[in-house]
Amino acid sequence: MLLIDLAGYELTQEEQELLEHPLVSGLILFTRNFHDKAQLQALIKSVRQRVKKPLLITVDQEGGRVQRFREGFTKLPAMQSFLQLDRLQLAQEAGWLMSAEMFALDIDLSFAPVLDLGHCSKAIGDRSFGEDVATMLPVAEAFIDGMREIGMAATGKHFPGHGHVIADSHLETPFDDRPKETIFNHDIQPFKQLIAKGKLSAIMPAHVIYTQCDSQPASGSSYWLKEILRKQLQFNGVIFSDDLGMKGAGFMGNYVERSEKALQAGCDLLLLCNEPDGVVQVLDNLKYQPTPTQKERYLSLMKRKQISWSELTASPRWQQAHQQLATLQDQWLEWKAQNA
């Protein structure tokens, strides 16, 4: 059950054939797929029309430095800004607006929000709402409530917490040597509490090895995904692997081995990006048949609400939220400059 990427602005015949493979469930879009809104809408329409099966179309449109579509879209401030600048009431509107803009493009899912604690990690930084569970959790929950209000599934990442490793898992495999008790009493709490409230439809584990807990990265660890996430926390939603093309996943072997280990560990859907040869290797060599439960889980993430861009941007709610978020973005950039 792979989610793969596209090379450019248009769907090629080869990419169409890959998307039609029975082991491919969807795709993830990047900035390289975006020239302008009209082109992006045409690309998505082409995918929907040419590939004759349900495809989950996804993106990372978190806000801040991780916002794949910018020109013509609302500038979403980094998640840290909502707590740092005491704009908690805007968090729900941000979740709603981000989701609404993606739905208006016929995108099913934005992988959000980040639930990692702390700002020291190179990979996370101001993508995190905050450092303390008690203060960040209401903000994260409000953002999720905004997503859920319009019908977008929330994906909590990066389980059980990526915020306290300096290394960037895009570039290397990070190791977290802190005691097990610290991770369970601190980092895992946002996930635990939001799962208990039924707020998370999906979870994305980290490519981090928690040395005092298990020898494998969480994304390839049955301890983290089956024992802790499924059994202990009673999570019954979708588990996405983080991008198996990242250097942090290299600990698990080649692309086929990474995919096998992630599936065996408990992942339902696998992201494999920026490695077209790796995608072909996996599709040619992976011996895997998704279960009916896994198919049901992934189909549950498909968007249910139809909304046009013109209707959305004409609504008073969007116009007000758009302006408020633009103001917060300016305030956040000013705050960062003053506190650099």
From Swiss-Prot:
Keywords: Cell cycle, Cell division, Cell shape, Cell wall biogenesis/degradation, Cytoplasm, Glycosidase, Hydrolase, Peptidoglycan synthesis. InterPro entries: Beta_hexosaminidase_bac (IPR022956), Glyco_hydro_3_AS (IPR019800), Glyco_hydro_3_N (IPR001764), Glyco_hydro_3_N_sf (IPR036962), Glycoside_hydrolase_SF (IPR017853), NagZ_Beta-hexosaminidase (IPR050226). Substrate binds at residues 60, 68, 127, 157-158. The active site is at residues 170, 242. One of its GO terms (biological process) is peptidoglycan biosynthetic process. Its EC number is 3.2.1.52. Disulfide bonds: none annotated. The keyword Cell inner membrane does not apply. Transmembrane segments: none annotated. Pathway: Cell wall biogenesis; peptidoglycan recycling. One of its GO terms (molecular function) is beta-N-acetylhexosaminidase activity. The record marks 168 as: Important for catalytic activity. PANTHER family: BETA-HEXOSAMINIDASE (PTHR30480:SF13), BETA-HEXOSAMINIDASE-RELATED (PTHR30480). This is Beta-hexosaminidase. It comes from Glaesserella parasuis serovar 5 (strain SH0165). The gene is nagZ.
